[in-house]
Amino acid sequence: MNICIFGSGAIGSYIGALLMQSGINVSLICRGEHLNAIKNNGLLMQSAESGTEYFCKPLATDNPKDIEKQDFIIVTLKAHSAALTANMLSPLLKESTTVVSAVNGLPWWYFYKTSGKWKNYRVK
């Protein structure tokens, strides 16, 4: 099984490390300093509760074309970035790919200048 974490910041990297710990083949899409840190150092997951550590070195890239087609894609981006990256998923998709949204960071202005029921609604 191949799973891609699309948006591997803190939450995405944590999910990816947990999946790798379970023996699943995981690839991470991330960028900038976080990408460089993962490529150079891998991921170290530490549990404050149990005191255990888990180290892994997943395939990490900023280019979805570097990764084979996936069985699952977990999108762990901030809400304001999700729509902008939808087209970037296409190289990862096959007919049976499942895409799971784990989007976070819904800002108060999310509905600003939208139409319909939620037009200009302020998230509280």
Where does each model-flagged region fall?
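NAD(P)+-binding Rossmann beta1-loop-alpha1 motif at the extreme N-terminus of oxidoreductases
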Residues: 1-47
